[in-house]
């Protein structure tokens, strides 16, 4: 009997995308190695780092980076190309994610990065060519990251047209797709209180056992691992939203609705 090929669709979601690292590690710990990977925006970056064998390296940077490390990417003299300095972004991608001369064909399994064509609102799949260029195009959030030119096209963040690339995973060979939607329940998220009691936050030993005994135990363990990972990086007592949070959250309201319709169909 033919073995089903597993696809991993890593969605867009700004800084929430670091949670993808936790999801991948949880899957690998369960003995699940995806045969196909497709990513949109930050999902494309994490997916490429995984296939390049640099996931641990990227995780170390995320955990150890300071506010100064992040601010160095921004161009204070804002121009039409965006706030983020393209040279510094490229340097980050080539030192932390993948080597500059790596092509998608160099990976040991199919990979796709999703971008949006500003000219016609269409979708652009990167399934070949330079990986760094593909990532930059896929995560070029309008106004924040520089627009990427690809021949006659101007490309921006793929989250505008396909936030969670399930359909792309199927198209490049997957039979079953594990989709990671970072925008689920985004609206109203910040209205909830961040401080949760230990009893509310941590499941009891009994509930953990029940989770592992029922059919959904695997998915619950993966979700718990990803949540714990995300909280370990972004735990903060500051309830104030920064400019980036506001802009990214506003932009991601539309992808959330689009994602639901695409995953349903």
Predicted regions and their residues:
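Patatin-like phospholipase
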Residues: 1-40, 48-265
